[in-house]
């Protein structure tokens, strides 16, 4: 077990709530990333790419959570899903946070569905507040994280390559459920294990 994994285990289970990406969109994103990573520049390997089998749109990151609180979080997910209808999402374009010049995260954007995603995040925040969680007042920014590049010298170049490759990306899907995931670190990119799923009403 890595130091990070040991710390997380001591603090609780690292949880987040997200909308899963369907397999057909995941396949298209995987092809895009494979193209960027296979461009022949060894600098691309310096960027820490996420596991593509666990792609998701994060609604709320909860962080280390005590085992006694997991059931309350799952209930909040159920209440949120029961109040939100399914909606359409379009993944399109790429970018970097906080900027291409100094990227910490590389991502694909949301061309349609951002308002519904933000409303879902607000509804989940309300449901979590009812069971004792602090509200997250930061603006919700819908995106699909593909890589972490903080402190990597080649980050800006890889960000530009991803943005160029993503210019033609337009992948629609129907958001139909909310999933409570556990993030398990150690031995490479984190694995995302679904703990609870609730269908949107």
What are these model-predicted stretches?
Residues 1-201:
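Histidine-dependent nucleotide/RNA phosphoesterase domain, centered on the 2H-phosphoesterase fold
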